Regions:
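Active-site-proximal beta-alpha loop/turn segments in soluble metabolic enzymes
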Residues: 5-18
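Histidine-acidic metal/acid-base catalytic patches
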Residues: 12-13, 21-150
């Protein structure tokens, strides 16, 4: 079972505000308090961005002993766009370095459904988009591995 860092919007002004486990220290407290082999952290990297947190800092603060799953996507730090990595404002060089530093070996879920919005249903275009997502994922994985060997 994985718990995820979350946010919500203030109902009065629409601003993004913290929700459960948005803060990495709080997230650590919850995981450590339950102290169960069945509860792990799923760090949503895009949620780090929209809550004005540095994803690399969150990764290092939580460590590989807690983080066993990632939701990997990019955004503009204003909206939870769920677009493909390297198409927004996230710093993927520092993220892949941090993942290497904690020797990350968990799940890597590319959660970039927003990348497909507006593409229509043309199978050739969708196939090319999927191939691009695969190439970006492979690049991120290579970057993590290359940083581990340094």
């Amino acid at each position: 079972m994985a718990c995820e860092n979350m946010f919500h919007r203030d109902p009065h002004n629409g601003h993004i505000i913290d929700s459960v486990c948005a803060d990495p220290e709080e997230f650590n407290e919850y995981i450590d308090m339950v102290n169960s082999e069945y509860l792990v952290a799923c760090l949503d990297l895009g949620h780090c961005g929209v809550t004005n947190r540095d994803a690399a800092y969150c990764i290092r603060k939580m460590g590989g002993e807690r983080i066993k799953a990632l939701h990997v996507h990019d955004n503009d730090f204003v909206n939870d766009c769920h677009t493909m990595p390297m198409m927004g404002e996230m710093d993927w060089d520092s993220i892949t370095k941090a993942l290497a530093d904690i020797n990350y070996s968990g799940n890597f879920t590319l959660e970039s459904d927003g990348f497909f919005r507006g593409m229509g249903k043309d199978e050739n275009i969708l196939l090319q988009a999927l191939k691009l997502k695969e190439a970006v994922s492979r690049k991120l994985m290579r970057d993590i591995m290359n940083n581990k060997s340094r």
